[in-house]
Protein backbone atom coordinates (compact mmCIF):
# COMPACT_ATOMS: atom_id res chain seq x y z
CA UNK A 1 0.00 0.00 0.00
CA UNK A 2 1.33 3.42 -0.99
CA UNK A 3 0.79 6.42 1.30
CA UNK A 4 1.13 9.96 -0.02
CA UNK A 5 0.92 12.61 2.69
CA UNK A 6 -0.35 16.04 1.62
CA UNK A 7 -0.74 19.33 3.46
CA UNK A 8 -3.75 20.88 1.77
CA UNK A 9 -6.93 19.89 -0.11
CA UNK A 10 -5.34 21.43 -3.20
CA UNK A 11 -2.35 19.10 -2.96
CA UNK A 12 -4.67 16.12 -2.52
CA UNK A 13 -6.70 17.13 -5.57
CA UNK A 14 -3.62 17.59 -7.72
CA UNK A 15 -2.10 14.27 -6.67
CA UNK A 16 -5.34 12.39 -7.22
CA UNK A 17 -5.76 14.01 -10.62
CA UNK A 18 -2.24 13.05 -11.69
CA UNK A 19 -2.93 9.42 -10.85
CA UNK A 20 -6.16 9.48 -12.87
CA UNK A 21 -4.42 11.25 -15.75
CA UNK A 22 -1.74 8.55 -15.84
CA UNK A 23 -4.35 5.81 -16.13
CA UNK A 24 -6.36 7.67 -18.77
CA UNK A 25 -3.28 8.37 -20.89
CA UNK A 26 -1.74 4.90 -20.67
CA UNK A 27 -4.83 2.70 -21.08
CA UNK A 28 -6.47 2.25 -24.47
CA UNK A 29 -10.07 2.28 -23.22
CA UNK A 30 -9.89 2.89 -19.47
CA UNK A 31 -12.67 2.43 -16.95
CA UNK A 32 -12.74 4.68 -13.89
CA UNK A 33 -14.71 3.83 -10.77
CA UNK A 34 -16.20 7.08 -9.48
CA UNK A 35 -17.08 8.16 -5.96
CA UNK A 36 -19.34 10.96 -4.73
CA UNK A 37 -19.56 13.14 -1.63
CA UNK A 38 -16.99 15.73 -0.62
CA UNK A 39 -13.85 13.56 -0.86
CA UNK A 40 -13.36 13.61 -4.66
CA UNK A 41 -14.62 17.16 -5.35
CA UNK A 42 -11.17 18.67 -5.73
CA UNK A 43 -10.06 15.87 -8.03
CA UNK A 44 -13.07 16.39 -10.28
CA UNK A 45 -12.37 20.13 -10.32
CA UNK A 46 -8.83 19.35 -11.55
CA UNK A 47 -10.25 17.13 -14.29
CA UNK A 48 -12.45 20.01 -15.43
CA UNK A 49 -9.71 22.62 -15.16
CA UNK A 50 -7.23 20.55 -17.13
CA UNK A 51 -9.84 19.49 -19.69
CA UNK A 52 -8.75 15.87 -19.38
CA UNK A 53 -9.45 13.94 -22.58
CA UNK A 54 -12.10 11.47 -21.41
CA UNK A 55 -13.39 10.54 -24.85
CA UNK A 56 -12.14 6.95 -24.42
CA UNK A 57 -13.15 6.70 -20.75
CA UNK A 58 -16.01 4.65 -19.34
CA UNK A 59 -17.12 5.42 -15.78
CA UNK A 60 -18.95 3.28 -13.24
CA UNK A 61 -20.23 4.86 -10.05
CA UNK A 62 -20.02 3.25 -6.64
CA UNK A 63 -23.55 3.85 -5.48
CA UNK A 64 -26.87 5.66 -5.64
CA UNK A 65 -29.71 6.35 -3.24
CA UNK A 66 -32.92 4.35 -3.57
CA UNK A 67 -36.10 6.25 -4.54
CA UNK A 68 -34.35 9.55 -5.19
CA UNK A 69 -35.17 10.80 -8.71
CA UNK A 70 -32.20 11.37 -11.00
CA UNK A 71 -33.05 15.06 -11.29
CA UNK A 72 -33.01 15.51 -7.50
CA UNK A 73 -30.01 17.67 -6.61
CA UNK A 74 -28.97 15.15 -3.94
CA UNK A 75 -28.97 12.14 -6.24
CA UNK A 76 -25.63 10.86 -7.40
CA UNK A 77 -26.83 11.00 -11.00
CA UNK A 78 -27.27 14.75 -10.51
CA UNK A 79 -23.95 15.05 -8.66
CA UNK A 80 -22.01 13.39 -11.48
CA UNK A 81 -23.72 15.49 -14.14
CA UNK A 82 -22.89 18.66 -12.23
CA UNK A 83 -19.30 17.72 -11.43
CA UNK A 84 -18.16 15.94 -14.60
CA UNK A 85 -20.63 14.59 -17.13
CA UNK A 86 -21.90 18.02 -18.24
CA UNK A 87 -18.32 19.25 -18.63
CA UNK A 88 -16.30 16.43 -20.20
CA UNK A 89 -17.23 14.06 -23.06
CA UNK A 90 -17.03 10.51 -21.70
CA UNK A 91 -17.33 7.40 -23.85
CA UNK A 92 -19.93 5.87 -21.53
CA UNK A 93 -21.16 6.53 -18.00
CA UNK A 94 -22.97 4.22 -15.60
CA UNK A 95 -24.66 5.00 -12.27
CA UNK A 96 -26.88 2.49 -10.43
CA UNK A 97 -30.57 3.15 -10.97
CA UNK A 98 -32.11 3.66 -7.54
CA UNK A 99 -35.49 4.27 -9.18
CA UNK A 100 -35.63 0.82 -10.80
CA UNK A 101 -38.91 -1.04 -10.29
CA UNK A 102 -36.97 -4.23 -9.47
CA UNK A 103 -33.95 -3.31 -7.37
CA UNK A 104 -32.64 -6.88 -7.15
CA UNK A 105 -32.58 -7.09 -10.93
CA UNK A 106 -30.87 -3.69 -11.06
CA UNK A 107 -28.10 -5.03 -8.82
CA UNK A 108 -27.61 -8.00 -11.15
CA UNK A 109 -27.63 -5.70 -14.18
CA UNK A 110 -24.98 -3.50 -12.60
CA UNK A 111 -22.79 -6.49 -11.79
CA UNK A 112 -22.98 -7.34 -15.49
CA UNK A 113 -21.84 -3.82 -16.36
CA UNK A 114 -18.87 -4.18 -14.01
CA UNK A 115 -17.97 -7.55 -15.53
CA UNK A 116 -18.05 -6.04 -19.02
CA UNK A 117 -16.04 -2.98 -17.95
CA UNK A 118 -13.27 -4.05 -15.52
CA UNK A 119 -12.27 -1.04 -13.43
CA UNK A 120 -8.72 0.22 -14.00
CA UNK A 121 -8.81 2.74 -11.14
CA UNK A 122 -11.42 2.93 -8.40
CA UNK A 123 -11.71 6.16 -6.39
CA UNK A 124 -12.83 5.75 -2.78
CA UNK A 125 -13.48 7.92 0.22
CA UNK A 126 -13.70 6.42 3.69
CA UNK A 127 -16.48 6.82 6.23
CA UNK A 128 -15.88 7.66 9.86
CA UNK A 129 -16.80 4.07 10.71
CA UNK A 130 -14.58 2.69 7.96
CA UNK A 131 -17.28 2.16 5.36
CA UNK A 132 -16.38 2.21 1.66
CA UNK A 133 -19.14 2.91 -0.80
CA UNK A 134 -22.23 2.28 1.31
CA UNK A 135 -20.76 -0.96 2.66
CA UNK A 136 -21.22 -0.66 6.40
CA UNK A 137 -19.43 -2.60 9.17
CA UNK A 138 -20.37 -6.26 9.03
CA UNK A 139 -20.72 -6.38 5.24
CA UNK A 140 -19.23 -9.63 3.86
CA UNK A 141 -15.96 -9.04 2.05
CA UNK A 142 -17.20 -11.06 -0.95
CA UNK A 143 -20.44 -9.10 -1.39
CA UNK A 144 -21.56 -8.09 -4.92
CA UNK A 145 -23.61 -5.03 -5.84
CA UNK A 146 -26.52 -4.99 -3.40
CA UNK A 147 -29.23 -2.98 -1.66
CA UNK A 148 -28.27 -1.68 1.76
CA UNK A 149 -30.08 0.01 4.61
CA UNK A 150 -28.12 3.08 5.65
CA UNK A 151 -27.01 3.24 9.26
CA UNK A 152 -28.07 6.15 11.43
CA UNK A 153 -24.47 7.41 11.56
CA UNK A 154 -24.21 7.43 7.76
CA UNK A 155 -27.56 9.19 7.43
CA UNK A 156 -26.44 11.80 9.96
CA UNK A 157 -23.16 12.30 8.08
CA UNK A 158 -25.13 12.93 4.87
CA UNK A 159 -27.73 15.17 6.52
CA UNK A 160 -25.72 18.27 5.59
CA UNK A 161 -26.68 17.69 1.94
CA UNK A 162 -30.44 17.67 2.69
CA UNK A 163 -32.90 20.23 4.04
CA UNK A 164 -34.17 18.03 6.86
CA UNK A 165 -33.48 14.63 8.38
CA UNK A 166 -36.56 12.91 6.99
CA UNK A 167 -35.37 13.77 3.46
CA UNK A 168 -32.24 11.63 3.83
CA UNK A 169 -32.83 8.29 2.06
CA UNK A 170 -32.88 5.13 4.14
CA UNK A 171 -31.55 2.74 1.47
CA UNK A 172 -29.04 2.73 -1.37
CA UNK A 173 -27.61 0.52 -4.09
CA UNK A 174 -23.88 0.07 -3.71
CA UNK A 175 -21.10 -1.85 -5.36
CA UNK A 176 -20.26 -4.61 -2.93
CA UNK A 177 -16.87 -5.01 -1.32
CA UNK A 178 -16.20 -7.98 -3.58
CA UNK A 179 -17.02 -5.79 -6.59
CA UNK A 180 -14.70 -3.01 -5.40
CA UNK A 181 -11.82 -5.41 -4.83
CA UNK A 182 -11.88 -6.46 -8.49
CA UNK A 183 -10.53 -3.02 -9.49
CA UNK A 184 -6.97 -3.21 -10.80
CA UNK A 185 -5.92 -0.17 -8.80
CA UNK A 186 -7.57 1.71 -5.92
CA UNK A 187 -7.16 5.34 -4.85
CA UNK A 188 -8.47 6.18 -1.38
CA UNK A 189 -8.52 9.81 -0.25
CA UNK A 190 -8.97 11.06 3.31
CA UNK A 191 -8.81 14.53 4.82
CA UNK A 192 -9.33 15.78 8.35
CA UNK A 193 -9.35 14.53 11.92
CA UNK A 194 -12.83 13.02 11.60
CA UNK A 195 -11.34 10.34 9.36
CA UNK A 196 -8.36 9.63 11.64
CA UNK A 197 -9.81 6.62 13.47
CA UNK A 198 -10.94 4.99 10.22
CA UNK A 199 -7.56 5.61 8.57
CA UNK A 200 -5.79 4.13 11.59
CA UNK A 201 -7.92 0.99 11.29
CA UNK A 202 -7.28 0.82 7.54
CA UNK A 203 -3.51 0.99 7.96
CA UNK A 204 -2.94 -0.67 11.32
CA UNK A 205 -6.12 -2.48 12.32
CA UNK A 206 -6.99 -6.14 12.04
CA UNK A 207 -8.32 -7.45 8.74
CA UNK A 208 -11.97 -7.64 9.74
CA UNK A 209 -15.46 -7.14 8.35
CA UNK A 210 -16.03 -4.93 11.41
CA UNK A 211 -14.12 -2.26 9.44
CA UNK A 212 -14.89 -2.59 5.71
CA UNK A 213 -11.86 -0.54 4.62
CA UNK A 214 -9.46 -3.13 6.07
CA UNK A 215 -10.25 -5.34 3.08
CA UNK A 216 -7.89 -3.06 1.14
CA UNK A 217 -4.99 -4.52 3.13
CA UNK A 218 -5.29 -7.55 0.84
CA UNK A 219 -5.45 -5.61 -2.44
CA UNK A 220 -2.17 -5.56 -4.40
CA UNK A 221 -2.34 -1.96 -5.64
CA UNK A 222 -3.76 0.66 -3.27
CA UNK A 223 -2.73 4.29 -2.92
CA UNK A 224 -3.87 6.33 0.08
CA UNK A 225 -3.63 10.11 -0.24
CA UNK A 226 -4.22 11.74 3.14
CA UNK A 227 -3.32 14.78 5.19
CA UNK A 228 -1.57 14.80 8.56
CA UNK A 229 -4.86 15.15 10.44
CA UNK A 230 -6.27 12.01 8.83
CA UNK A 231 -3.04 10.19 9.73
CA UNK A 232 -2.76 11.70 13.21
CA UNK A 233 -3.67 8.51 15.10
CA UNK A 234 -1.31 6.28 13.14
CA UNK A 235 1.92 5.11 14.71
CA UNK A 236 5.23 6.68 13.76
CA UNK A 237 6.22 3.33 12.28
CA UNK A 238 3.49 3.52 9.66
CA UNK A 239 5.98 4.58 6.96
CA UNK A 240 7.95 1.41 7.65
CA UNK A 241 4.87 -0.77 7.37
CA UNK A 242 3.80 0.76 4.05
CA UNK A 243 5.56 2.48 1.19
CA UNK A 244 5.42 6.19 1.94
CA UNK A 245 5.94 8.46 -1.05
CA UNK A 246 6.55 12.17 -0.83
CA UNK A 247 5.56 13.48 -4.25
CA UNK A 248 3.23 12.35 -6.99
CA UNK A 249 6.34 11.80 -9.14
CA UNK A 250 7.57 9.27 -6.60
CA UNK A 251 4.22 7.55 -6.78
CA UNK A 252 4.09 7.44 -10.57
CA UNK A 253 7.63 6.05 -10.70
CA UNK A 254 6.35 2.94 -8.91
CA UNK A 255 6.35 0.27 -11.60
CA UNK A 256 3.04 -1.09 -10.31
CA UNK A 257 1.10 2.06 -11.08
CA UNK A 258 -1.07 1.55 -14.12
CA UNK A 259 -0.32 -2.17 -14.29
CA UNK A 260 -2.95 -4.84 -14.05
CA UNK A 261 -3.20 -6.28 -10.57
CA UNK A 262 -4.04 -9.94 -10.10
From Swiss-Prot:
Coiled coil (residue ranges): none
Enzyme class: hydrolase
Residue intervals passing through the bilayer: none
GO biological process terms, semicolon-separated: carbohydrate metabolic process; glucosamine catabolic process; N-acetylglucosamine catabolic process; N-acetylneuraminate catabolic process
Assigned EC number: 3.5.99.6
Keywords, ordered alphabetically: Carbohydrate metabolism, Hydrolase
Stored PANTHER family: GLUCOSAMINE-6-PHOSPHATE ISOMERASE (PTHR11280:SF5)
Protein name listed in UniProt: Glucosamine-6-phosphate deaminase
Amino acid sequence: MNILVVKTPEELAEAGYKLIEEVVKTKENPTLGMATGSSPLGIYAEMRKNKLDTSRVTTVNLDEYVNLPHEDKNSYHYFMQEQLFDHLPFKQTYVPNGMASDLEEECKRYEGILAANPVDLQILGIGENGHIGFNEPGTPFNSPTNIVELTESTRQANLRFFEKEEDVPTHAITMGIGSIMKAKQILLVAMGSKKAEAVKELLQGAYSEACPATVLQRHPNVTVIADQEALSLCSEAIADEHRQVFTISDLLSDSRVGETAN
